[in-house]
């Protein structure tokens, strides 16, 4: 796992790798060894590429127009490489979305601009991706998630939203967020969105109040589900534990879980959101083979199949707080006790979200697992494969 530290007020460019086996962090060299613009990272856009590398762009300032550099970190070589220097729009407060063709989409955050661009990891170059029907950025921008259909739902910090179709490289309008009773427009500035098992999207909202000096994200922050079939927003009932009337959407942290639920953390509170609906069978992972059907603790096994990493990144924030979950997980249920445990999965050949793409990964079972006949399932993006 890669982590880059450096909010604007911290003025750092520290970067770390997390070792899940030893539960420890190791500091690595910063992008470009900290030279040039990379003396601090700010709140940079970044994305995990399907081959395991991480792409990170310079945060910059709205007052400067020359910040178009990106770096790619290769965990195998432990090295950074300059890329994407032909980008036209600023990367300030932008977000990067992995597409179903393994490319990366971003909506530019220059004020008053509606343009978008696509990065091709194979060439290291950006190309135009059309214009959104309405401006989505307002010094901040909302999350943009690839849906199981392959289209991208891009949410705006202006109240406007849009859908991108990679097949046609074109945009269409999605419904705006509603207004509050006092007339303030609900928006998604620095807000999380999560794909639900049904393919709908859970998102938090807020208001974005700007003066001549600065902009402030404020509550209330009601939750909505985007119904991808109806192309409509549905208000989610308020919760007493984390009341939307006193919360700021930018302070939520949301994570999709292999149970199909969404974990929502806000300050010192944690709760779980359960939705209705089931996934389409064509979204399910397909397990072609497993290296052994007799599973023993502390032994490595390999699974091969298709769509093992799902058809979406799972979660998106907009810029600096990404926690994508497009990687496979192994769930083991003891038939007698129905106790569930999870193996540690690793060495993913690919985390591509292309439909029907083939891949492999390894897993190792916890030494403390219960003995006895068990059901093994592969989980991706809250969707279980048939029992194996």
Predicted regions and their residues:
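Beta-propeller blade signature
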Residues: 13-21, 68-75, 115-121, 161-166, ...
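Entry beta-strands of beta-propeller and related beta-repeat scaffolds
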Residues: 1, 5-9, 51-57, 101-107, ...
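Trp- and S/T/G-rich repeat-edge/linker motifs of beta-rich repeat architectures
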Residues: 19-35, 72-86, 123-134, 168-183, ...
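Immunoglobulin-like IPT/TIG beta-sandwich domains and homologous Ig-like subdomains
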Residues: 1, 30, 39-42, 126-131, ...
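Short glycine/acidic-enriched loop and turn motifs that connect beta-strands
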Residues: 4-9, 60-65, 110-113, 159, ...
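Blade-level signature of beta-propeller repeat domains, shared across WD40, Kelch, NHL, RCC1
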Residues: 247-284
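A detector of repeated loop/turn-to-beta-strand junctions in beta-rich toroidal repeat architectures
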Residues: 12, 43, 65-67, 91-93, ...
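Beta-propeller and closely related beta-sheet repeat lectin domains
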Residues: 42-46, 93-96, 141-144, 189-193, ...
């Amino acid at each position: 796992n890669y982590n880059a530290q450096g909010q604007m007020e911290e003025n750092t460019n520290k970067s770390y790798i997390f070792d899940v086996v030893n539960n420890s962090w190791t500091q690595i060299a910063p992008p470009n060894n900290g030279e040039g613009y990379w003396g601090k990272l700010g709140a940079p856009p970044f994305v995990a590429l399907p081959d395991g590398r991480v792409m990170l762009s310079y945060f910059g300032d709205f007052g400067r127009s020359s910040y178009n550099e990106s770096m790619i970190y290769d965990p195998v070589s432990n090295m950074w490489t300059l890329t994407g220097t032909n980008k036209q729009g600023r990367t300030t407060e932008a977000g990067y979305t992995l597409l179903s063709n393994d490319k990366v989409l971003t909506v530019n955050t220059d004020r008053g601009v509606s343009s978008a661009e696509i990065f091709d990891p194979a060439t290291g170059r950006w190309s135009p991706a059309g214009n959104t029907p309405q401006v989505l950025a307002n010094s901040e921008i909302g999350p943009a998630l690839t849906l199981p259909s392959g289209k991208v739902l891009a949410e705006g910090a202006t109240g406007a939203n849009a859908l991108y179709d990679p097949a046609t490289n074109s945009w269409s309008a999605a419904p705006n967020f509603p207004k509050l009773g006092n007339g303030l427009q609900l928006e998604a500035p620095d807000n999380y969105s999560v794909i639900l098992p049904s393919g709908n999207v859970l998102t938090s909202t807020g208001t974005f109040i700007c003066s001549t000096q600065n902009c402030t994200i404020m509550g209330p922050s009601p939750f909505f589900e985007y119904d991808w079939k109806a192309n409509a927003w549905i208000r989610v009932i308020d919760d007493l534990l984390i009341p939307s009337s006193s919360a700021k959407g930018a302070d939520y942290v949301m994570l999709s879980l292999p149970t199909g639920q969404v974990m929502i953390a806000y300050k010192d509170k944690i709760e779980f959101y359960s939705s209705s609906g089931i996934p389409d069978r064509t979204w399910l992972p397909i397990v072609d083979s497993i290296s052994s059907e007799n599973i023993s603790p502390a032994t490595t096994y390999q699974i091969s199949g298709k769509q093992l990493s799902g058809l979406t990144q799972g979660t998106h924030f907009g810029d600096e707080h990404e926690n994508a979950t497009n990687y496979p997980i192994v769930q083991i249920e003891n038939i007698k006790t129905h106790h569930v445990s999870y193996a540690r999965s690793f060495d993913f050949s690919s985390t591509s979200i292309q439909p029907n793409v083939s891949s492999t990964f390894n897993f190792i079972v916890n030494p403390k697992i219960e003995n006895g006949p068990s059901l093994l399932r592969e989980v991706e993006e809250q969707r279980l494969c048939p029992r194996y």
